[in-house]
Amino acid sequence: MQLETQDALYVALELVIAALAVAGNVLVCAAVGASSALQTPTNYFLVSLATADVAVGLFAIPFAITISLGFCTDFHGCLFLACFVLVLTQSSIFSLLAVAVDRYLAIRVPLRYKGLVTGTRARGIIAVLWVLAFGIGLTPFLGWNSKDSATSNCTELGDGIANKSCCPVTCLFENVVPMSYMVYFNFFGCVLPPLLIMLVIYIKIFMVACKQLQRMELMDHSRTTLQREIHAAKSLAMIVGIFALCWLPVHAINCITLFHPALAKDKPKWVMNVAILLSHANSVVNPIVYAYRNRDFRYSFHKIISRYVLCQAETKGGSGQAGAQSTLSLGL
């Protein structure tokens, strides 16, 4: 099948994004695994986020490319391809929400934080959040799908009954997942509320931090620790903001499709392609933010790339630098 120029460009850009997403987020996971300074509950949630982004590069983007070509397949196979990215998106949102709550506790109750948020509890929470993400993302399999309309043209069997269970459909996202699910359940129910909650949490974090910084009785050490927490919160708020900017265009188009179908029919194909590319590009951004905002991540990235990519031997001064870096173990 020969691709049009527009489709070929879309596929090429998706493949570039997939490669960068996998490489960058595998590097994040390796950095946390290799550096004791990065093995904090906050970063466990970031590893969960990175895992979702790796899966976007390995699976969701190839699935999206497949769906964009509109090949014929059975309904439930196409539905799985369409829903898998919803699972990963929901997992990312839950991971970001968990990080926001974690940072709020670190600033609101600093003396009790280490007892409340342990590595074991963080890993347990991550497991629960992934189960919830799969449940939410695969909800269309429970019946909230477009099977009746997608298979309405199936040929009837000899007894006059259409065999819809094995009827091939043109595998396009809107052919299998109804916009009512995407807008009312996915966006209004599962995406927008967590984003608004995170907005409130980060506003509260900065309000609490500013009040504490204004207290004259704060000792120099406590003040330095709090400033590091504020720096971490700013970095994480930046990640949430980038996530919202990357994903809201897709949801805006879905809302237009549902509420103004006549207007949606006239939209060029490239508009949706650009929105999808932007949402997938979000999986590339986070490692860049970590490297730019956090010395521990930056040092660990450099160490891993030097040793395993450039095949350079580690210098003797490396352990000393790692020791100096390990004093900052507050996430970002």
Curated annotation (Swiss-Prot):
Q: Does the keyword Hydrolase apply?
A: no
Q: Which GO terms describe its molecular function?
A: G protein-coupled adenosine receptor activity; G protein-coupled receptor activity
Q: What's an example GO cellular component term for this entry?
A: synapse
Q: Give the highest taxon in the source lineage.
A: Eukaryota
Disulfide connectivity for this sequence is 78-171
Positions contributing to adenosine binding: 174, 254, 279-280
Q: What's the protein name?
A: Adenosine receptor A2b
What organism does the UniProt record list as the source?
A: Mus musculus
Q: Which gene encodes it?
A: Adora2b
